[in-house]
Amino acid sequence: MATCRNRTARWIGLTILGVLVLMIIKSCKSSRPDGAVVVKPFDADKYLGKWYEIARKDFKHEKNLNNVTANYSKNADGSIKVVNKGFNYKTKEWQEATGKAKFAGAPDEASLKVSFFGPFYSGYNVIAIDPDYQYALVAGESLDYLWLLSRTSTMPEDVKDDYLRCAQAIGYNTSDLVWVEQSSKY
């Protein structure tokens, strides 16, 4: 009987260890789609502040959200505080999520990892930005995540077109982007 318990305990221990190792490996790297090249040099201080989401690949954490903004500020430890906010047009309620971003490598490269759920990080890669840091194209860790961001609630058509071409060249299907309503009525 004791041998059976020992085997079970050992199996559970090895399973937990395996899961922890996978979590550590996943959280230590920032991934991005093949062909996506991050902005370098990147000025994190110029990137801080409020950004409006113009378009995105839809996923469960942003489902049914309009008026989406992201606000970036520096934490005391040098990481970046991320506050995402959006209005759920189905429930008629504001939703907010606070997370933390860290550089995946050198601080002058726009390859970051962001977490809203404890030790679990996802890739956040600025792959295009204008010289004045007014418009940005952000790739996630796979072709399932993409954002077009602007410092204002609109983006000029020529910038949109350039960013869409850039995303398509990497392999993104941009026909299913959600174009976010930015309205003052909420």
Model-derived features: positions:
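A beta-rich soluble binding module of mature secreted/lumenal proteins
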Residues: A2-Y186
